[in-house]
Amino acid sequence: MSNITYKADEYADSKKFPFRIHVEKYTIFELLGDPTGKRVLDAGCGDGIYSRQLVDQGASFVIGVDGAKDFIELAKQKNGGYEERIQFVHSFIQDFPGNGDLDSVIASYVLSYPKSLEEATAYCKAMASHLKSGGKLIGFNNNPFEVFDGVKHADYGFEKEMHGDTEGSPVIYRVAGMDNPIVNFHLHPKTYERAFREAGFSEFRWQRVLLNPNQQGNSYWNNFFSNEPSFVAMLAMK
């Protein structure tokens, strides 16, 4: 059952926020590298914005998968001109095994939804099944190293609320322009590391999120990057 109660069009609009462009998008594409000629799985594709950008940057084929039906419907509406190179599928990622024929996976917030090691491992196994040997997964996720009690970050278009680091406890994002909150779940870093290992990935590392160089020196970002940012990247190799 989906934990997603927010509207697809509202969420798509949030992709215009500065942190989503200059931190989220920049980090994902910088870690992915040149996608020219690559076959890519866009896990948790939402309205397909990164699927289309992957093709624009040279990817030969992209599969976009999302568990929310209205997101996939919106992605298909925006897919004009991309039909031959992007396939959108309505499925939860853990229920969508692959054939080991893709070069890369990008997973935007997908791994913020499991509530346990077992669930996280199922997500990771499904994504691993799409990758060739030597294939790469880039994740962008709620940061499990950031633990606090209260609310923070209202000045970046969202408020993040959490209360301690109990495994499976909710992490709530209230995003400007969205009627309903985004509810993620906290897992310990070691839980994620074990899930990737049990899913068959040969390498895994955490990566601090990156800031687009054209924003360097902009004091707007000082609070975002103080201590542990609210988000973190993951890099795994099969």
Where are these regions (language model features)?
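SAM-dependent methyltransferase
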Residues: 138-197
